[in-house]
């Protein structure tokens, strides 16, 4: 399992989410994806807004999605 974090440098909620993630011990690795630098990947996942977290299985199958700035509690509940 891994988490894809879709964000952009100009996105204030993305920066707040990154600070929240930095303070957490997550059960899965997080891969940061800048939608401006990797628009094809953002399109492949149908990203319509940032920040967006996508949980993937080891086979690359999407297990869940969380859109917008979220609290630590929201993120941990989503991952459980």
Stretch-by-stretch model annotation:
Residues 5-6, 25-40:
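Thiol-based oxidoreductase modules, predominantly thioredoxin-like and allied folds used
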Residues 55-80:
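Non-catalytic, surface beta->alpha helical segment in thiol-disulfide oxidoreductase systems
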Residues 16, 40, 71:
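Residue-level recognition of oxygen-bearing side chains
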Residues 44-45, 72:
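Chalcogenol-based redox active-site neighborhoods
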Residues 1-24:
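Local sequence-structure signature of Cys/Sec-based thiol-disulfide redox active-site neighborhoods
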Residues 8-11, 36, 69:
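Short, surface-exposed acidic/glycine-rich loop or hinge patches that mediate macromolecular interfaces
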Residues 45-54:
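Structural micro-motif
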